[in-house]
Regions:
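Specific pore-lining/lateral-gate transmembrane helices of multi-pass inner-membrane transport
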Residues: 1-90
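Membrane-proximal transmembrane or re-entrant/amphipathic helices at the cytosolic face
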Residues: 143-154, 158-194
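Membrane-interfacial segments
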Residues: 35, 39-44, 108-112, 141-146, ...
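Alpha-helical transmembrane segments
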Residues: 73-82, 133-149
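Membrane-embedded alpha-helical segments of multi-pass transporters/permeases
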Residues: 25-33, 38, 59, 98-103, ...
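Short, surface-exposed helix-loop/turn micro-motifs enriched in polar/charged residues
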Residues: 6, 117, 143-146
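Membrane-interface helix-loop junctions in multi-pass transport and translocation proteins
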Residues: 54, 84-86, 90-132, 163-177
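Hydrophobic, membrane-facing alpha-helical anchors
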Residues: 60-75, 120-136
């Protein structure tokens, strides 16, 4: 593939990820909220054991979102001209996950419920490291910079969604503009079908 075609495909993949993000965050939360009472005893939902299952899942949704957003550059790194970088990438993400787990879980709170919540936070932060490393190691940082306004909206909107859902406040409404990426997402899907 030519560099121009590669950039076009990377932008289309990013458009698709931007378009999927709000649906995944809100859809995942809605599914968990609906099915959690069917799958878990009340003690896992009311905070008896520390963090509720819904709270833990909501924090993990942040990690899902960050992993989704890393997909285009992660894939570019994996399929790039220097496959050894992908091995180094995996090693660095693993080391970051171990460090975050050590600090937040092993050295963190003593109560088991809080440890579980801390583990979810560590997992989501590891996904953030994965995203940042995929940008840097794939050599696609310029493509990301070129779309910095969109990335800023995605990060701010996604943060408001997660913060609002975790705190059960209306902060999530400030993430609704992410649905504006739906049209770009559909356009990206249609272009892959042509």
């Amino acid at each position: 593939t030519s560099p121009l075609e590669h950039r076009r495909e990377l932008n289309q993949a990013t458009d698709l990820c931007f378009g999927l993000l709000p649906y995944g965050l809100f859809g995942g939360y809605a599914i968990m909220t609906f099915f959690a009472p069917l799958a878990f005893p009340e003690a896992y939902l009311d905070g008896t054991h520390g963090a509720s299952a819904v709270d833990v899942f909501t924090v993990l949704l942040a990690g899902w979102g960050l992993t989704l957003l890393a997909t285009p550059t992660y894939t570019s790194l994996m399929a790039g001209q220097h496959p050894w970088r992908f091995t180094l990438f995996i090693l660095l993400v693993l080391l970051a996950a171990i460090a975050l787990g050590f600090v937040l879980v092993l050295e963190g709170p003593a109560e088991p419920g809080r440890k579980l919540y801390a583990a979810a936070v560590a997992s989501s932060l590891s996904a953030g490291v994965l995203l940042m490393l995929s940008w840097w190691m794939s050599g696609e940082l310029e493509v990301v910079r070129h779309r910095r306004d969109e990335w800023t909206l995605v990060f701010i909107g996604g943060s408001f969604i997660i913060a609002g859902l975790v705190s059960q406040t209306l902060w999530w409404t400030l993430g609704l503009p992410l649905f504006l990426f739906t049209k770009q997402g559909w356009k990206a899907v249609r272009s892959t079908l042509d």
